[in-house]
Amino acid sequence: MLLVDKVAQRVVACAAFVVSGGVPTVAVALSGGRDSAALLHAVAAWRDAAGVPVRLVALHIHHGLQADADAWEAACARMAAAVGAAFRVRRVRVSTDAGRGIEEAAREARYAALDALCAETGATLLLTAHHLDDQAETVLLQLLRGAGLDGLSAMPMARERRVTLLRPWLDVPRGDIEAYARAHALAWVEDPSNGDARYARNALRPLLAGMAGHFPAYRASLARSAAHLAEAAALIEEVAQTDLARIAPAGTLAVAGLAALSGPRQRAALRAWLAGAGLRAVSSRRLEDLRAQLLGARADGAPCVRLPGAQVRRYRGQAWIEAAGQPGAGPADCPIAVSRFDPARAEVQRVDVAAWGGALLFSPAQAEGIDARILQAPLSLAARRGGERIVLRPGGPSRALKQAYQEAGIPAWARARLPLLYAGERLVFAAGLGPDRSAVAMGSGWHVAWLPAVGQDGLDAG
């Protein structure tokens, strides 16, 4: 029962498993293969043995890449029914139009579909059957591709995003899962592509089998190295965020501040800055080109560096990220209601506003924050219409918003995508400038930030 015990320990330890006032929904990603079939069985065994009040749902992604895909879906439905789990399926179209390989494209489509199904079913926790051999393969593949620390860190045991992803068997060898499946006489489907050497993982497996004779502990050793690299990556990220707090406090990046850093810290800060805007898949070559153009252009130059899905501009000593192909148009004139912020909850709150392509981040502030009483009025985001005025220093006069943007060095092409936050009819915050000081509380209040989203979140390997 070792594998069932691992499921029990790691699921219960997840904060996402605890649902206040209700029964948690735990989802299992079920491809129909041996590993995921064993995981579904083990989760159900834990549920039944412990009498845990949990709703179990099996999620199957139909890629349509194999002739037997419909039969696999039917097999997965039977597996779910056998253990009393709900069953949901999502059909996806795998596109390689963006220059990605079929494996990467299928993985991205699969994770996006799993996230969507979790949202539909109310699942707070998603389990996948990745194991120690998968982790070893991932580390070696990333090494052969010349990946950086993030790639070489491979797959984390848990990942916090829209739903918590947990890999409870990431330290379990494939052989243990095979033994579990045989011991319980489980049925599963065989994917013929697993023997196709055109796929990178399959091509690597015979080499790993040979390696095991000389290095029997290679799986655990590679996983241990990945853990060390993940810790190093976390340290670099911490340093980068400290640098960004100083050189990019309002979202735009001060080029002079970047130039004052060492080369490695420049690259780390740029990666973190781009990642904060959703741009995670930026190659080393593109990053170096961006660094060179930001730091090497003439003082009066205005370089524009194109990246996948976005572009970076430099203007008056500041670097800006904007979505590619969008010349500076905001959403429709009608205000967009901001209804998911609760000033009574003293915690960081993120409110995504799809119409504006970004999010508002509300953080409790001991000083210099917008008065919570003012924020109790209906909140809305709106575009500039002309004639707005704002107070930017305590006790100071109001000034024209257009003039304030000009003095702040915000270029005209960027202003149209900077929303204004209103509490009722009162302007309380202007993206790119900050709060209206007449709305700032003497004591505690709320710090507001605007986070433009110009790309999509990255996906974990696997």
UniProtKB/Swiss-Prot annotation:
Binding-site residues, ATP: 31-36
Subcellular location: Cytoplasm
Top EC class of this enzyme: ligase
Name of a matching Pfam family: TilS_C
Record SUPFAM superfamilies: Adenine nucleotide alpha hydrolases-like (SSF52402), MesJ substrate recognition domain-like (SSF82829), PheT/TilS domain (SSF56037)
PANTHER family per record: TRNA(ILE)-LYSIDINE SYNTHASE-RELATED
Function: Ligates lysine onto the cytidine present at position 34 of the AUA codon-specific tRNA(Ile) that contains the anticodon CAU, in an ATP-dependent manner. Cytidine is converted to lysidine, thus changing the amino acid specificity of the tRNA from methionine to isoleucine.
Protein name: tRNA(Ile)-lysidine synthase
Species annotation: Ralstonia nicotianae (strain ATCC BAA-1114 / GMI1000) (Ralstonia solanacearum)
